[in-house]
Amino acid sequence: NRRSHGAGGAGRTEVVESVFGITKADSGKVFLNGKEVTGKRSPRQMMNLNFGLLPEDRQKQGLHLHWSINHNISLPVIDDCTNAVFLSGKKEYELSNKMKELLAIKAPTVDTHSGALSGGNQQKVVVAKQLAANTKIIVLDEPTKGVDVGSKAQIYQLMSDLASQGMGILMISSEMPEVMNMSDRIYVMSEGRITKEFKAEGLTQEE
């Protein structure tokens, strides 16, 4: 697990968005699993390379709030739920119910509108979309922002579980205790550049 830390305006989100193809970088190269993918940087292309992003603004960038949990989760893999030109509702529901149970999303059913969920459960739906898409590397941009203490603990546990299963995780956070407790390695950014790098083990906040 890697963590990027810096104050607001440090350029962390901008770097990630340029890597994922949301915005265009002025320069630089992107490598994924040792292969250069600089020319393949649209969100759809990066998703096809099993690279996922959980954006900081989940309500605007991560979810369709007026859609159900079911439709949000199945969106990235809609082709897998389609037979010719017909959408398989059965496959959709099987997938979304599996993710609801796996991530302990608190909602009466997967037909519940995502906008009716708590912040923590909305975050879980965004993560579920990435898992459904078979993501291998995921960037979590302020994943616990605006969620309650209980949901934070669940998100931390989920991150640990995913990392133990082999998923690569880069978390962007401005909360120092979160960074130190959830990291293997920490990168500090300022003005769009990495200024320091630390191994998390044995690190103190003063350092």
How would you name each of these model-derived features?
Residues N1-E207:
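Glycine-rich phosphate-binding loops of nucleotide-dependent enzymes
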